A protein has these predicted regions:
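GIY-YIG nuclease catalytic motif and its immediate N-terminal context
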Residues: 1-69, 97-164
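Short arginine-rich
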Residues: 34, 39-45, 71-91
Length: 164
């Protein structure tokens, strides 16, 4: 299973810093972003290791669809380049989902329509206010949680080492 996620930094000096990505192992990837293990993104490096997942969309049928969703989260307008100011920060990143989630396809590279599979959106209780729940299509289940951790993740435990 593949996941798309939005991270936020919990440190006051980096409170407006966000990052989004895709992975097949969110907890390992979070540890990388927090510099506990090798492999985090350049954008999250040197920011105090205080990243947390504030939204996580799961259920992608393949890596292509997950990467297409990741790109659309980075470019909510559908055009490459710098994100508009209204899509920056935690509020902007989460509110951009209002326009992204209802799309039939994230990009032209998607090989199936989004309505053809079920997705689940885990979202933190303190950011759900930025999501217009009326925009969320029926094939996406919403779970409002206080923390997004390993209990929100479904992994093939034989394929991945699963450490917290």
């Amino acid at each position: 299973m593949w996941y798309c996620y939005i991270l936020r930094n919990k440190l006051p000096q980096f409170k407006n810093n966000t990052y989004n990505g895709s992975t097949n192992n969110p907890m390992r990837r979070l540890r990388q972003h927090n510099e506990e293990i090798k492999g985090g993104a350049r954008a999250t490096h040197g920011k105090g290791g205080a990243w947390e997942i504030c939204t996580m969309l799961s259920g992608f049928p393949n890596h292509i669809n997950a990467l297409s969703c990741e790109w659309r989260m980075k470019c909510p307008s559908g055009k490459p380049g710098k994100r508009e100011g209204k899509y920056q920060g935690v509020r902007g990143r989460v509110s951009s989902l209002n326009g992204i989630l209802p799309l039939e396809r994230w990009t032209g590279k998607c090989i199936v329509d989004n309505m053809d599979f079920n997705l689940k959106l885990h979202i933190l209780s303190d950011v759900v206010q930025y999501l217009d729940l009326t925009c969320v299509p029926e094939h996406i289940t919403i779970e409002i949680v206080d923390v997004i951790d390993s209990s929100c993740v479904e992994l093939d435990k034989e394929m991945y080492s699963f450490e917290e």
